Amino acid sequence: MLATGQVLAQSKAVSGTVKSQQGEPLTGVTILIEGTTQGTSTDAQGAFTLQAKPDDMLAVSYLGYKSQRVKVGTRTKLEVVLTEDQNLMDEVVVVGYGTQRRRNIVGAVENISGEVLENRPNAYLLRSIQGQIPGVNITMADGKPSRSASINIRANTQSIGAGGSALCLIDGVEGDLTAMNPEDVESISVLKDASSTAVYGARGAFGVVLVTTKSARKDKISVDYSGSVSIISETVRPKYETDSQTWYDNYMTAYVGYSHHLPTGINNFFPWTQSWEDEYKKRMNDPDRSYLEWELDASGKYQYYGRNTDWYDLFYKKSTTAHQHNIRISGGGKTSSFIASARYYEQDGIYRVGDEKFRQLNARAKGTVNITKWLTVENNTDFVRRSYHQPTTYAQNLLVRRNLEHQGFPITRVTNPDGTWTAAAVYTGYANMAEGNSYRDNLKFDMKNTTVVTIDLIKDVLVAKADYSYLFNHSRQNDVISQVTYSNGPGIQISYPASSSMRTTETQIEYHSGNANLSFTPRLPEDHSLNVMAGWNIEHKRARNTRMGRDGFIVDGKPNYSLMNGIDYVLEDANSYDWGFVGIFYRASYAYKGKYLAELSGRYDGSSKFPSNERWGFFPSASVGWRMSEENFMKDISWINNIKWRFSIGKAGNGNVSPYKYMELLDFNKAGVIVDGSQRTYTSAPSSVLPANLTWETSSTINLGLDVNLLNNRLSFVGDIYQKETTDMFVTGAELPAVTGYSAPYGNNADMRTRGFEVSLGWTDSFRVANKPFNYSVRLSLWDSKSIITKYTSKSNTLPTLYANAYYEGMELGEIWGYHVVGLFATDEEAQEWGLKAQEKTFWSGDNKSWNAGDLKFADLDESGVVDNGSNRLDDHGDLRKIGNSSPRYHYGINFSANWNGIDFAVFFQGVGKRDWYPAGESGLFWGQYDRPYGYSLPWQNADRWSEDNPNAYWPRLRGSLARPTIPTTATCRKRATAA
């Protein structure tokens, strides 16, 4: 009590105000007594009061302002003035071949710091940045850890010809971001418009992603370790019918509804007879017999009466696990520094059977040596090893899902009474995967080394920089298919497939690149800032792809080419290539008083992929900026921190074509017959004539942008609108006369216009919880684009179908053409009367071309008396109409992060607001038994299918092959409008 009384006697009430440099009171400023948890915050007038001792030091902090330390002393009233923290505007952002301060950037450039990535821990870098940057669309085909992603910047399809995706550079060298260790990343910059990507020329036609890895700091040696264990769960588990009786009844309805006759077998491996069905129904309806799932028929073969076999559950787990370990060592002294990191990641597979496993090892070593005051040498070595073991079925295409859908009937069994495999176990692939002798092994090595030499010719004025990079990649894929024995009766052994086999594909890639540039930053009067950079770049890439294979293992389970007795082959296939790029680039940036900004940049590119007379192209750009917030009429408005307008215009080339498109090539193939113990090689005439003048695709972009920071940088806004004209796209041209025997030649035959916008709105703030600061940030992003074909040399005007893309002038990319459905027939009489009116209709309900109640009724929109697609051309499309668009629209991202008392929390959402989709015929989890009668039976279809008691159902009467036509209809969406 005495001690407490003494402390209270020394404390006193201290009050004060906190204001900005402009004299505006600041609300919510945190005032904390250093070394304690005692503190307070300012009110709406910027005032505060707290108990403090004369020796106490007050820490005053506020978002967007520099923190201050104020000693209490003998004062009881304090006046604190905080100055704005210009770090946000002074932040250094990595751009092409250099860096720039954010305040001076006039191109469309976005940046993500390492701190943001740390708040979104993920084993895969690209998943950590999904939804973070407007205009960046990251697409992954599936969740496999080995799968590379597609990165498109601005527009989902940049070109219908050469195609391509963003150029991804890791410390200036092209690399695979999927294989990168996220812990190594210092920052990520995304260059989106022609102005910011111009120095990369044709290599940056689709935008550029620049990843900078962490560098060593000149400090004592430190060792950091981090590890994690993850549980990875499936996002959606398909809902399908496992009740045998329901599945079988639907199968018979679908099969007979289309073919109008009884089956002889269910998908060619499960025998069907009328006597089998009679017995099966008896067992299903007789409780005393239903447990008997098999018996021997008169020929001594098994008759199966399986019940409720859940094949999907037999194959797939609901979740799996992964673990990773990271270690980093760094340190340095006055003249040198180093950093080395390593990571091991392992993820188990999703199959219950087979030992599916993915492993990845990353290692990086980076060091810098200051040899003299003006000479610095840096070396960066990166190594990645990935291995992926996948159990597979009886075929090398790994179509586990398709096998399961088409052979995994609930009425079948996995094993026979004697423990042998059933035919169903083999045809689904379950037996192969369980035995573990059929698999695909992928092994990939990446080694990359970059050496950089920097010479300060005139300190901070004239800097020369040169680098050389070498990348070596070796990948090997080994497909092993072993025979599995099943039985369809006691003592009967059948091996499947007919022969065991092994196929090996090896790819070796070597990549060399060299860069040299000179940067000049003259010492000018304070109001002026200038930087001029010019450089040279050369790249060479060579790939060799070899395939080999052999059939017939002498010893099962011993996949070795020397232990096989079949015919073997070795060949180098068309995936081998060799190309080179060379470019000369420049950039000049100027700023006047920090508010008037201008930049000129460009590149002169040459590529070996084009004929000698078309190999070179010049791609310039220009951009200007105006920091309106620095004008006198706005400079003193305290709540405005930055308002900057940006405008850019530029042109980029696209050289993403095959290296040999301008050459007349002959394909060599192996004959299908064996002569004198070997397969003969043969060739034929070229399939098409050469393009007359193959040259660069080019894209010209205009961009208008606005950057806004308000309320002490707590509120931020970034917006861009742009138009991109892509010309000379590499597509097929006009059809040649049939007498030539050639298909239409490829060439620069199409143009496309893309218009779009990007906006993001962010809020960053803090307040106190339990006398401790709670920091949080929210960011909302929205972006969209639409592309129109403005020129198409081929005048065939063919319309797209489910399985074939087609284009025409004026077409919006992603258009879906299809038939309209006006409803379902109510009675057989109505259906048959409609069918008799046009015996030449395109759509029929089955092999006998009859219509019944519950069938789809198509609209004869052109009133021709026939429902058809004419010649499937724009000028003769019959009853086809535009019924949707498959292009994703209105991409959005929502990001929220917070931290308090050492606890970090982050959540994000990303998606698209609108997209039409038409499931193709093999989309079994949508179509179910409307596709193949023996496919999945889907509960949501069963609950909303036409019947006499449910005439207003969504789904028509059940019959197979409804989903097989190549032209979509408006009958598969809730609004009766489907996609192709």
Residue ranges and their predicted role:
Residues R102-R103, V199-G201, D219-K220, S233-V236, ...:
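Switch/connector loops and helix/strand junctions flanking conserved nucleotide-binding motifs
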Residues M1-D348, R352-A363, T376-E378, P773, ...:
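Short, small/polar-rich motifs associated with maturation and membrane association
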Residues D224-K301, R547, S766-G884, F926-G928, ...:
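Conserved small-residue
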Residues L117, G164-S165, K366-R385, T393-Y394, ...:
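Extracellular/periplasmic, surface-exposed regions of secreted and cell-surface proteins
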Residues S233-E234, F315-Y316, S638-N641, I788, ...:
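C-terminal beta-signal and adjacent terminal beta-strands/loops
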Residues Q158, V173-A216, T235-Q245, T253-Y255, ...:
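Outer-membrane beta-barrel proteins
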